[in-house]
Amino acid sequence: MKMYRIRKDDKVMVIAGKDAGKIGKVLKILRKKDRVLVEKTNMVKRHMRPNPYAQQPGGIVEKEMPIHVSNVMVVCSACGKATRVGYKTIESEGKEKKVRFCKKCNEVME
């Protein structure tokens, strides 16, 4: 399984594409397709047929579409900048724990 430096509920900035510069929260990670679903970005309109069995009205619906994971960067909660993420081990109570940290300000991101 692939390891991503982005996790669900992370605050990320889109760095490429039509929504470049927008900041949003990661709603879902699609590991098989290397994509993430970011809140309020890459919005598209879909024409939905009414479905009376599911009580779904028809019409034009706006929804988010996935963005490739290489086109987003994590926004650090400490410095507020889009940054790369690194990993380091921290020893606490005799146990070593692997944590993510901001490469710009070296603050732990958890």
UniProtKB/Swiss-Prot annotation:
Listed under GO biological process in this entry are: translation
Name the GO cellular-component terms. Answer: ribonucleoprotein complex; ribosome
Name the InterPro entries on file.
KOW, Rib_uL2_dom2, Ribosomal_uL24, Ribosomal_uL24_CS, Ribosomal_uL24_KOW, Translation_prot_SH3-like_sf
- Name recorded for this polypeptide: Large ribosomal subunit protein uL24
Q: Which SMART domains match?
A: KOW (SM00739)
Name the gene. Answer: rplX
Q: Which family does it belong to?
A: Belongs to the universal ribosomal protein uL24 family.
Q: How does it assemble?
A: Part of the 50S ribosomal subunit.
Question: What is the recorded function of this protein according to its Swiss-Prot or TrEMBL entry?
Answer: One of two assembly initiator proteins, it binds directly to the 5'-end of the 23S rRNA, where it nucleates assembly of the 50S subunit. One of the proteins that surrounds the polypeptide exit tunnel on the outside of the subunit.
